[in-house]
């Protein structure tokens, strides 16, 4: 039945069954496929955080390719329910209408988020029953924030007016709020961050099959838990052992700290093929994984270990990890290199290491006994994704922008980073924080070593070319592969695990010259373009690298303007290194003086060692 304008009920209304099924609708809605329609009903006092959490959850789920829409109480009263007041009858009708609309969104395959005080239990029960009758999931989410905290927030000044008697029937003051008896989830938003609340709801949706595991923003560390450590230490002594290289150990560190979440260890063949052919992991949703993380094995080790349910990995004689349920498969080196690098020329240094490695690969679940350390004076900078998340929370960062680098920082880089922060502030972010994240794994011989780079970066911070109060400097443990646009996706994906939501990409990222022709292996613009299209990276906003050059008029690095070409001088990396080797001084404003001094000192030391 339906109401007519004269107040009579329409009796000639028949419910029509649609031709398109939910399963079929789910195939074309969103990026992940599958029907995910449901309603998450946020309820709680005014100022509890319902809308804030709902909007943040909507932003997160959409970034993961999951169609989501947030219905907010104030917004709905501007349109659909603008003819309703705040009497008990009008409040009931307000919630009834919203319940029906939410059900339609959910039936359309959308995750519908509703944020309404909805103080009465019977109204919330009605919303639930409407969904249950339609066979749609309904999750009641009680945002349980104490009244005193809500009053302290009082952004709209409503509590103050209610206390003064200017608003009658205000929930929590002179009208009772009926707390849910058994909500699917209870969020204590008074003492938890918005991000923590969002992830609790995401975990609930994942457990109920609405959200795939790959969309849960949890870092999967592969360390043996404290409770099982003694048993693992006793077990590893009796296991067959395989000695691994320093490069392999760096990949153990990457995996164990959760940079490659959701991988549970070195790739088995199924994961390897997905990475090689699709640039993604596809089980449980789409996760970008453009580079294979694999463990090469020589034939003698394969023959010795095949059939074992587990074996130990040892580096420099120390057993560091257990590989369980191993799977051996052929290492097709030329094909791997051709797909990953666009060349199988052994003059490319990482290709050379692959070609010299074992003829087999082994995948399996990794259990790492303790954190990988290198005792080189830099371990304090090797922060895990979880540690970086904690650091950003402590800084109250509301945006994190990451800058990947393997070279010394000059003032052109610094200009880009400070300009990015300025633009984020203009967009409304209160405290954007820079993750200055130099790559700390293997690099080719002619790159500046990590220890010298870290000293140079610290000098940049000490001279306040970059603001140290809004910068976190840490080491990214991955080896460098020089695989261009393929590798830059890995660099971006790994930073997502830290909570970074912006990523600065430069010209020719992860590029190098062809070992024979000396021409660039990759188009210098393709890395930035690929990142804007890559599957599984929609959570990350890409900040393209604007060209910076030395402005002779300003005696400073500046964004290049082709209309003022004669004012600019380009100082390439090759030219910069040549000047440092010769002990020359660059133009004033090109690099912080103390940072340049470190560059000169490095090349002087290198020359003496040679």
UniProtKB/Swiss-Prot annotation:
Annotated Gene3D superfamilies: HUPs, P-loop containing nucleotide triphosphate hydrolases, Sulfate adenylyltransferase
Top-level EC class: transferase
Claim: Secreted is one of the keywords in the record: no
Record SUPFAM superfamilies: Nucleotidylyl transferase, P-loop containing nucleoside triphosphate hydrolases, PUA domain-like
Chemical reaction(s) catalysed: sulfate + ATP + H(+) = adenosine 5'-phosphosulfate + diphosphate; adenosine 5'-phosphosulfate + ATP = 3'-phosphoadenylyl sulfate + ADP + H(+)
Motif extent (PP-motif): 506-510
Segments for region (Sulfate adenylyltransferase): 206-610
Catalytic-site annotation from UniProt: 118
Keywords: ATP-binding, Kinase, Multifunctional enzyme, Nucleotide-binding, Nucleotidyltransferase, Transferase
Binding-site residues, ATP: 44-51
Free-text tissue specificity from the UniProt record: In adults expressed in coelomocytes, body wall and gut.
Function: Bifunctional enzyme with both ATP sulfurylase and adenosine 5'-phosphosulfate (APS) kinase activity, which mediates two steps in the sulfate activation pathway. The first step is the transfer of a sulfate group to ATP to yield APS, and the second step is the transfer of a phosphate group from ATP to APS yielding 3'-phosphoadenylylsulfate (PAPS: activated sulfate donor used by sulfotransferase).
Family, as annotated: In the N-terminal section; belongs to the APS kinase family. In the C-terminal section; belongs to the sulfate adenylyltransferase family.
PANTHER family recorded: BIFUNCTIONAL 3'-PHOSPHOADENOSINE 5'-PHOSPHOSULFATE SYNTHASE (PTHR11055), PAPS SYNTHETASE, ISOFORM D (PTHR11055:SF1)
Protein name, as recorded: Bifunctional 3'-phosphoadenosine 5'-phosphosulfate synthase
Species annotation: Urechis caupo
């Amino acid at each position: 039945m339906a109401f007519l304008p004269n107040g009579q009920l329409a009796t000639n209304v028949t419910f029509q069954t649609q031709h398109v099924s939910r399963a079929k609708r789910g195939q074309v809605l969103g990026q992940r496929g599958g029907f995910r329609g449901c309603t998450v009903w946020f309820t709680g006092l005014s100022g509890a955080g319902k809308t804030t959490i709902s909007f943040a959850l909507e932003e997160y789920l959409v970034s993961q390719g999951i169609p989501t829409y947030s219905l907010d109480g104030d917004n709905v009263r501007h349109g659909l329910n603008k003819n309703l007041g705040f009497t008990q009858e009008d409040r009931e009708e307000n919630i009834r209408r919203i319940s029906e609309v939410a059900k339609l969104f959910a039936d359309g395959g959308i995750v519908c988020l509703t944020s309404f005080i909805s103080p009465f239990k019977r109204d919330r029960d009605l919303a639930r029953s409407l969904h249950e009758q339609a066979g749609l999931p309904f999750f009641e989410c009680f945002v349980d924030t104490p009244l005193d905290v809500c009053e302290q927030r009082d952004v709209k000044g409503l509590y103050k007016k209610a206390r003064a008697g200017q608003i009658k029937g205000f929930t929590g003051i002179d009208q009772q709020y009926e707390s849910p008896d058994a909500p699917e989830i209870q969020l204590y938003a008074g003492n938890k961050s918005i991000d923590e609340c969002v992830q609790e709801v995401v975990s609930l949706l994942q457990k109920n099959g609405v959200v795939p595991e790959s969309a849960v923003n949890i870092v999967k560390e592969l360390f043996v838990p404290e409770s099982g450590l003694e048993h693992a230490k006793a077990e590893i002594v009796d296991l067959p052992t395989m000695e691994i290289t320093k490069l392999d150990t760096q990949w153990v560190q990457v995996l164990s700290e959760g940079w490659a979440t959701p991988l549970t260890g070195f790739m088995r063949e199924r994961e390897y093929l997905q990475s090689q052919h699709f640039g993604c992991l596809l089980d449980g949703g789409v996760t970008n994984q453009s580079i294979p993380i694999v463990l090469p094995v020589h034939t003698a080790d394969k023959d010795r270990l095949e059939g074992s349910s587990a074996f130990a990995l040892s580096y420099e004689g120390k057993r560091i990890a257990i590989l369980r349920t191993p799977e051996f498969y052929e290492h097709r080196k030329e094909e791997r290199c051709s797909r990953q690098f666009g060349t199988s020329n052994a003059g490319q240094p990482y290709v050379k290491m692959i070609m010299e490695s074992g003829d087999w690969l082994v995948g399996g679940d990794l259990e790492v006994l303790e954190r990988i350390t290198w005792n080189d004076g830099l371990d304090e900078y090797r922060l895990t994704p979880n540690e970086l998340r904690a650091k950003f929370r402590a800084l109250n960062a509301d945006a994190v922008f990451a800058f990947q680098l393997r070279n010394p920082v000059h003032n052109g880089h610094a200009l880009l980073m400070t300009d990015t922060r300025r633009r984020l502030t203009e967009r409304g972010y209160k405290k954007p924080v820079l993750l200055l994240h130099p790559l700390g794994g293997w690099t080719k011989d002619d790159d500046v070593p990590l220890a010298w780079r870290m000293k140079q970066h610290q000098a940049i911070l000490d001279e306040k070319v970059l603001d140290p109060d809004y910068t976190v400097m840490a080491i990214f443990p991955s080896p460098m592969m020089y695989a261009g646009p393929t590798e830059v996706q890995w660099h971006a994906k790994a930073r997502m695990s830290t909570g970074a939501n912006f990523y600065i990409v430069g010209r020719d990222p992860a590029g190098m010259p062809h070992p024979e022709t000396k021409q660039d292996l990759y188009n210098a613009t393709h890395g930035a373009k690929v990142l804007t299209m890559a599957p599984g990276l929609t959570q990350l906003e890409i900040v393209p690298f604007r060209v910076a050059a030395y402005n002779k008029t300003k005696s400073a690095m500046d964004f290049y303007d082709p209309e003022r070409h004669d004012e600019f001088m380009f100082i390439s990396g090759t030219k910069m290194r040549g000047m440092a080797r010769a002990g020359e001084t660059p133009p004033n404003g090109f690099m912080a003086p103390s940072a340049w001094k470190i560059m000169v000192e490095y090349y002087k030391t290198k020359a003496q060692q040679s």
